[in-house]
């Protein structure tokens, strides 16, 4: 401090009074900042946001101890001298300076509970002792940047918040990666999907990109997914509580929206996004599908810019996210509140398939998700024959019902995507069951059915002897749906 004052005095030739004023201003503004930073981190805490977090929670429903247990579990899967590098998600921009809402990388979040960008988790399995080293690298405290971008946790507060002993400034990460990379046998890294998978370092924080690029030129990397997806697949009690919360909120939103009348897809889409948030979710888990009439023939229809026509149905695929965990629901209902005879028959056919498939979601059957899908195709074939739609099983899977019966959900809407769908289901996996029917406007299919699209989807916890449907409060029985608009 004395050097700073001496330089300031010589350079600016302050009077004693002005120099004293500058010292006081500098001193107390800095102390004020430090006091505030000691109370507030780069994410919500149980002391600053008690309306979000209960005492002891690092993220909603989940404690720092549970995150440590997860790190211990993945460390037990590492071999001697294995090195794991898990980076936070990058900030993504729409264009120029306009950025998207930040969403953390699911693997990084699963292991740390940290919600900040530009962070790195390193884990190294010691060959001699069998123990593992774990270190977290966070952006340093910086009053100027925090004024623009929000608070940072920093290394000092990070040790206490995340209960990781070794938390350092992110500027130190490159040297550690370089040193550990040289003596590692296998390197695990969290590759991003899409084109970034061909440039693995491109999605990493800028301060380690050069280091990773050099390291990856001389080593072979494996995806952390092969270690983490099997662990993430089986949900803990706390994780299931998050998913129940997301499902309950989302199911109630469906019920309320089904009561109302809308003229435009955009209005209904906005209502879903709004109600998820005011109901207690963090955000929509994904861009809602709100498809009126034949728009539902596009399975991932998200443009949501058409008008509703009274004699048509609307297919909605939307769900909320709570504490990082998502729910996935699809419902189809008539715009005017009353199913026509054709709509009723086709809807009931799909519903029958869905309800039968849900019953298979238990470990006692020994079935895999693939087994349930193959059974759903058989059931769909039988149901459609009864209502007058005749097609081969190949035509059903290629045209009328071209997607799978379901997928895992959790921190991602298609969670643990590297898991083998042919493995028997395990207790506390959470999956979707979502048969669909999409009759194209083409010759060869009954005129009376053309343009009709139906999907019915629930989020389901796999049990030992019977499943638990998380989203059962979202109406799907015909009588219940019709009663909502009376």
Swiss-Prot record:
Names of required cofactors: Mn(2+)
One Pfam assignment: AMP_N
Annotated positions binding Mn(2+) 2: 317, 328, 457
Compartment(s): Mitochondrion inner membrane
CDD domains for this protein: Prolidase (cd01087)
GO CC aspect terms: mitochondrial inner membrane; mitochondrion
Membrane topology per record: Peripheral membrane protein
PANTHER family assigned to the protein according to its UniProt record, in alphabetical order: XAA-PRO AMINOPEPTIDASE 3
Protein name, entry field: Intermediate cleaving peptidase 55
Native source organism of the sequence: Schizosaccharomyces pombe (strain 972 / ATCC 24843)
């Amino acid at each position: 401090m004395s050097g700073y004052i001496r330089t300031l005095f010589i350079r600016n030739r302050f009077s004693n009074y002005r120099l004293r004023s500058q010292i006081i201003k500098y001193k107390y503004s800095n102390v004020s900042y430090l006091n505030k930073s000691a109370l507030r981190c780069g994410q919500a805490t149980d002391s600053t946001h008690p309306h979000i977090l209960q005492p002891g929670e690092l993220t909603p429903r989940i404690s720092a101890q549970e995150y440590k247990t997860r790190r211990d579990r993945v460390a037990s899967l590492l071999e001697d001298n294995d090195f794991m590098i898990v980076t936070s998600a990058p900030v993504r921009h729409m264009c120029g300076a306009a950025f998207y809402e930040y969403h953390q990388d699911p693997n990084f979040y699963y292991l740390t509970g940290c919600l900040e960008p530009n962070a790195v988790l390193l884990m190294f399995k010691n060959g001699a002792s069998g123990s593992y080293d774990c270190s977290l690298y966070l952006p340093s405290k910086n009053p100027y940047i925090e004024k623009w971008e929000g608070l940072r946790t920093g290394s000092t507060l990070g040790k206490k918040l995340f209960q990781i002993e070794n938390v350092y400034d992110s500027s130190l990460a490159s040297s550690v990666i370089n040193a550990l990379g040289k003596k590692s046998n296998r390197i695990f890294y969290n590759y991003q999907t899409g084109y970034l998978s061909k440039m693995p370092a491109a999605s990493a924080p800028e301060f380690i990109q050069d280091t990773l690029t050099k390291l990856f030129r001389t080593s072979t990397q494996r995806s952390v997914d092969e270690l983490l997806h099997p662990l993430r697949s089986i949900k803990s009690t706390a994780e299931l509580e998050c998913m129940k919360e997301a499902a309950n909120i989302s199911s109630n939103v469906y019920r309320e929206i089904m009561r109302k009348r809308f003229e435009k897809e955009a209005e209904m889409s906005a209502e879903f996004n709004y109600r998820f948030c005011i109901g207690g979710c963090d955000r929509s888990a994904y861009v809602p599908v709100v498809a009126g009439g034949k728009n539902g023939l596009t399975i991932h229809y998200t443009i949501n810019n058409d008008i509703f026509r009274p004699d048509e149905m609307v297919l909605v695929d939307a769900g909320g996210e709570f504490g990082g965990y998502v729910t996935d629901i699809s419902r189809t209902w008539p715009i005017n509140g009353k199913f026509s005879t054709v709509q009723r028959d086709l809807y009931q056919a799909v519903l029958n398939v869905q309800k039968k498939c849900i019953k298979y979601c238990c470990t006692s059957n020994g079935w895999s998700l693939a087994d349930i899908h193959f059974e759903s195709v058989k059931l769909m074939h039988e149901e459609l024959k009864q209502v007058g739609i005749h097609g081969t099983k190949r035509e059903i899977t290629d045209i009328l019902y071209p997607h799978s019966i379901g997928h895992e959900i959790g921190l991602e809407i298609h969670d643990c995507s590297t898991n083998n769908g042919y493995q028997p289901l395990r207790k506390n996996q959470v999956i979707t069951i979502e048969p669909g029917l999409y009759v194209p406007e083409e010759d060869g299919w009954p005129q009376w059915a053309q343009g009709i699209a139906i999907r019915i989807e629930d989020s389901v916890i796999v049990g030992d002897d019977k499943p638990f449907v998380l989203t059962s409060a979202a109406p799907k029985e015909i009588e219940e749906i019709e009663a909502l608009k009376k």
